[in-house]
Amino acid sequence: MVSVSYGCASSNAPSSTTPDTSAVSDAPETEEGMLQVRANGEDFVREGFVSKDGWEIGFEHVYVSLANVKAYQADASFDPETDATLEPTQDVLVVDQQTVDLAEGEADADPILMAEVSAPSGRYNALEWTMPKATDGPAAGHVLMLVGTAEKDGQVVNFTLRLDQEMRYVCGDFVGDERKGILEPGSMADLEATFHFDHIFGDGEAPPDDSINTGALGFEPLAAIAQGDTLDVDMAMLEEQLSPEDYARLQDTIAGLGHVGEGHCALQDMT
């Protein structure tokens, strides 16, 4: 199966990322601590933002279905932008399946805690998760469900986007202000699955020729298919109503959502 790495400013590069777990059973026993995994939609989701084409977007709900969330220890750092294979010495299943609302909480809220489990100490330097269709709750039947409003020049669109593009991400080290995943015996550490929704809509604060905008769909193509002040669509309707170019771009930008902080992930489909 071909896997593709998605990053904020890099081209899509082939990468073989199926973890080789043959060495896991041979890993030595170690003392344990508590390992957390959090989900983060960043300020774009919690505070709202302006799209590349000037729409002010605010979210009421951003439901994301996540499953098989696994943390890995590996002797060598895993780079999803190469064709290297992830060879873990330890793996921990942290979340079986869960739907989270990334828009939950105030603007300054912490990333959402999905779960914490007892885990062997060590450095967790890779993270994997799948995004299947939710089996229950308000987003049942969909992978992503975005609910909110968009406004531009006095026009308001109340939108509900139900997206069902299933995905699997394999990611390397978290990249951010703090190191994550270093678990000392008897202590606690965390990892983060990060979602960059500016990849879909672009960023009005970035230059038009910035890579975040040149690859983004924006909101204008979605506003154009709204019925009055309402847009309530699923993927089948989007495929029918958007131009082929815009629909393909939407699919590509959805695929590029998954990160670990600013760190990149390799994408594999689930078929």
Predicted features along the sequence, with ranges:
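Bacterial lipoprotein signal-peptidase II cleavage site
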Residues: Y6-T17
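Bacterial N-terminal signal peptides
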Residues: M1-S5
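Low-complexity, Ser/Pro/Gly/Ala/Val-rich intrinsically disordered tracts
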Residues: C8, D20-D26
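A short, solvent-exposed, low-complexity linear motif enriched for acidic/polar residues
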Residues: V24-T271
